[in-house]
Amino acid sequence: MNIYDFDDTIYNGDSGIDFFLYSLKKHKVKIKCILKAIIKYIGKVFGKYEIKDVKDELFDYLKDIKDLDLFVEEFWNKHEKNIKKWYLENQKEDDVLMTASCDIWIYPICKRLNIKHVICTQTDKETKKIIGKNCKGKNKIEIFNKMFPNANVENAYSDSLSDLPMFEISKNAYLVKKDKLIKYEK
């Protein structure tokens, strides 16, 4: 079993930022959402808010999109090309994707790529607000251990040292910089 981060690891860029920018072009994003997100982000810097609070404000406009599933499919029609070739060439059936990105846009691309095991930030279907914790760092591993209690992780891949908990549970770990895989020595 191999475990992968998504953004800047197997996806070239940050899918959340790309999704937001795509939304700005294709859908009316309320300025109010952006301003509230900026305020919450400043509050996060000072320890008043968490990243989930920022995401809740930033993606509040999603509840106004009439056919969100279609909108997400159209987004992936344009952005699927950002999946890195090295991943597609090495993909295995038991891969596990673990990402802080939201299920709203992660599940559809995983379905397209036939990735069956996905751990990501969960959102309420109606309100589009985040349920529980942002899926990052140790939170990823807590969920992973519940889903796969006796897993034997061969390789872990991430672009960030915030994913050290992923590296700690794997035999081999790789830092991903663009298309270059750098063996991480534990």
Regions found by a protein language model. Give the residues of each.
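Short, compositionally biased "basic patch" segments
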Residues: 34-61, 110-113, 117-118
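Active-site neighborhood of HAD-like aspartate-dependent phosphohydrolases
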Residues: 1-47
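Metal-dependent phosphoesterase signature
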Residues: 50-85
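A general boundary/transition motif marking the beginning of the first structured unit of a protein
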Residues: 7, 11, 26, 46, ...
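C-terminal cap/substrate-recognition subdomain and adjoining C-terminal extension
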Residues: 71, 76-186
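Generic structural signal for well-ordered secondary structure
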Residues: 12-13, 51, 137
